[in-house]
Amino acid sequence: MTMTNPSGNTPDTSAGPAFRYTAELAGEIERSWQQYWIDNGTFNAPNPVGDLAVSGDKLPEDKLFVQDMFPYPSGAGLHVGHPLGYIATDVFARFNRMLGKNVLHTLGYDAFGLPAEQYAIQTGTHPRTTTMANIANMQRQLGALGLGHDPRRSVATTDPEFYKWTQWIFLQIFNAWFDTKQQKARPISELIPLLESGEVALPEGFEGSADSYSELDAVEKAKVVDEFRLVYRSHSMVNWCPGLGTVLANEEVTADGRSERGNFPVFRKKLSQWMMRITAYSDRLIDDLDLLDWPDKVKSMQRNWIGRSRGAEVDFDALGHTITVFTTRPDTLFGASYMVLAPEHELVDALVAAGTNSYEGIDPRWTFGQATPAEAVKAYRASIAAKSDLERQENKEKTGVYLGVNAVNPVNGESIPVFIGDYVLTGYGTGAIMAVPAHDTRDYEFATEFGLPIREVVAGGNIAEAAYTESGAAVNSANDQGLDINGLDKQEAIAQVIEWLVDKQKGSEKIQYKLRDWLFARQRYWGEPFPVVYDENGLAHALPESMLPVELPEVEDYKPVSFDPDDADSEPHPPLAKATEWTQVELDLGDGLKKYTRDTNVMPQWAGSSWYQLRYIDPTNSEAFCDIENERYWTGPRSAEDSGGVDLYVGGVEHAVLHLLYSRFWHKVLFDLGFVTSREPYRRLFNQGYIQAFAYTDSRGVYVPAEEVEEKDGKFYYQGEEVNQEYGKMGKSLKNAVAPDDICRDFGADTLRVYEMAMGPLDTSRPWSTKDVIGAHRFLQRLWRLVVSEDDGSIVVTDAALTDDDLKQLHRTIAGMRDDYEGLRINTVVAKAIEYVNYLTKAYGSTGAPRAAVEPLVIMVAAVAPHIAEELWKRLGHNDTITFVPFPEYEDKWLVDDEVEMPVQINGKVRARIMVPADASQDQISEIALASEAVATHIEGKNVIKKIVVSGRMVNLVVK
């Protein structure tokens, strides 16, 4: 039967020699060897201790932990773009097994989260049912690719035996505090004595019945401790999406203030939420990037996200209140002509109340069309409620409201107006700015819009036209209280202003960060429940390990309570709140049986992926998330300077900040508490590119099936109608997805692997073209013919000795492929293999190539095309799997040419090419050049007045 695919380039399987390598034969070979690998546990990597240890065997000291960013099990299944990274890591792992390393490589499933829940709601099927079906389908698809995973180590975040340990790690973080002196997390149990002795003071602003911890009552003591925890409840501004019925993290909100999923409006409002104190680790998260072998782009993205900056906090007095601002440019204080607070700033209402609450005589541009500051603040807050932080920062149109209050500039005593404006956020700095419009673009735009003074304090620009934001000497910057920075450069001026502020008790030097604490709760059903209950006083209590896992209850109605998408005043009502028998419990937490209420939020989808690499190490351990001996073996540091961590982590750059930042934070807490020996989760990170494809839309903008589009005279048609071509990502919604199942059926999995690896460098994106897949298949057919006769299936290799040319070609191929494998340059691995196959085919096509030339080739291609390599290895007479056969070694002597070709220039023009011994002297090269017939013809009757010889490169003769 002839199989077809959309391209029409299916190998012809209905005719030809009986033993040709066809799609059908490839399928048989692949299924056979995949079963062999399963039956023999070929890719099972042993641990030092525990269930996965092998008794009596000493583990190799040389080991490798390779990890993929684990997939989300979507109902749509995989398209050919998804396996790109998985194939690459499999190739790298297989190559390293041939180097004798103990290789850990497996794959799990990140199965909790909003997509599964939304899909389940749409189909009426429980998310567990759809998730398990999706995992099974993905395992089938990935299994067909011949990926060398250790199946014993696979995990799913939705498995209670997995999320038991997610909850356990949450509790370790909950029961820890950050010691700023030691710059590390410590158990809460070590904090209590320090509070009792007074060595650690009560939190700033804490209001209790006494001034010392020891004199507080039990409830107050618990509240004090909660103020220190690395996990805490915060009544803070969050992104509330009524249409989805849940709070969203910043990364889940689009720039125009809508939910990434569902495109619903998102509103900023204050709610009580779980937060993780990731900001405590800001410095370590930045500084330890220097320890990592990561792309510079990713390191830069993390540094920018954390946003460490040095400057000063400055205090401005305003009617008995102090407005504190953070600035990196205290040298520009003399140019501050107004202040702007975030609309949500805690002082706004108090400042309005302290003022006259009148707009009499005020510029109408300052009033937002209202009669009083109180009315204007209320109206303005309502107008910006749906704006995301990103939209507020990027908005070119500056808006704001005058609070009816002025503040005093501390360096010159000037009274300056105080506004609120949406371009100032509570999430960075102090939520208030001193506006210096002459030297800040956004302040300049605001001042221009509201008619505010613009005063130059840094020389070098033309402030009549635009803000000057470059460096320059300070001007107009002196007072009569001992501060004069005129003429100083930026750094000198900053230092003097900070010194003056400290002396006058008007400010202090400060390091600030953009990074905010991590919002760690979702009002959904399909996520990890919190291992926390609340008593009658509303105090949170961590559950003991014996009560883990806290399993999701089976409920009939798991839909979130959603609201009118525009109802900004709605409040979250999590689905778990409906399970009253589950939420209301009686527990003995060490002080007798009492009634408690469970937390009805769930953890965000990031939770499981923040630590899953550690469970891969010890997936069957029921006593710990990971035995530290196993962790030390696989990810422990190998020197004092080594951070430790997974040896190679491959995934998309879209996870450069959030997932990687969160996992680094969790790992550092575990390190501080002594649960792991590695300081970082991932030593080396590699971002693969993407496989992209053409998509087509009709006149309505609707996508049409790409495989049914025809090209005629440079135009594209679908069912006779001309359509538009666009290029980008591959996906089901774009109707241009190609399933790996189809390619495996029509060509074989090895062909798919070879094609994807050969398309281009792994870290770049590349276009998919089904019609080009046939080229990879033909390469494998040529490889097959070097070993197997297509006519009768006999082995065609000979015992002939290798010629010098054979040895040169072989050893250069070995050296090149080995180097490229190590550098993840798999596209050039394939190119070198093709070149060597072509050489052997040309040299021995009719007589049979020497076994000594072919066997190393089969070994070298085994990492990329493992099924055909296993089959050829077996047919060559070997009984064991090729998986652990040592990768061939090369000899240096065969890498050097005996002769090299050199161009000969005469008066600057190439007139001949000569072959000279590789070690020839300049005099010898000159003699060979002059003896060349081509050279002799061009210099006949002329004098050679100069000879220039560059060994190994060229000869230049100057003649007259």
From Swiss-Prot:
GO terms for cellular component: cytosol. ATP binds at K732. It is found in: Cytoplasm. InterPro entries: aa-tRNA-synth_I_CS, Leu-tRNA-ligase, Leu_tRNA-synth_edit, M/V/L/I-tRNA-synth_anticd-bd, Methionyl/Leucyl_tRNA_Synth, Rossmann-like_a/b/a_fold, tRNAsynth_Ia_anticodon-bd, Val/Leu/Ile-tRNA-synth_edit. It catalyses: tRNA(Leu) + L-leucine + ATP = L-leucyl-tRNA(Leu) + AMP + diphosphate. Its EC number is 6.1.1.4. It is an enzyme of class 6 (ligase). Coiled coil: none annotated. The keyword Cytoplasm applies. A motif ('KMSKS' region) lies at residues 729-733. SUPFAM superfamilies: Anticodon-binding domain of a subclass of class I aminoacyl-tRNA synthetases, Nucleotidylyl transferase, ValRS/IleRS/LeuRS editing domain. A motif ('HIGH' region) lies at residues 71-82. GO terms for biological process: leucyl-tRNA aminoacylation. Belongs to the class-I aminoacyl-tRNA synthetase family. NCBIfam families: leuS_bact. HAMAP family: Leu_tRNA_synth_B. This is Leucine--tRNA ligase.
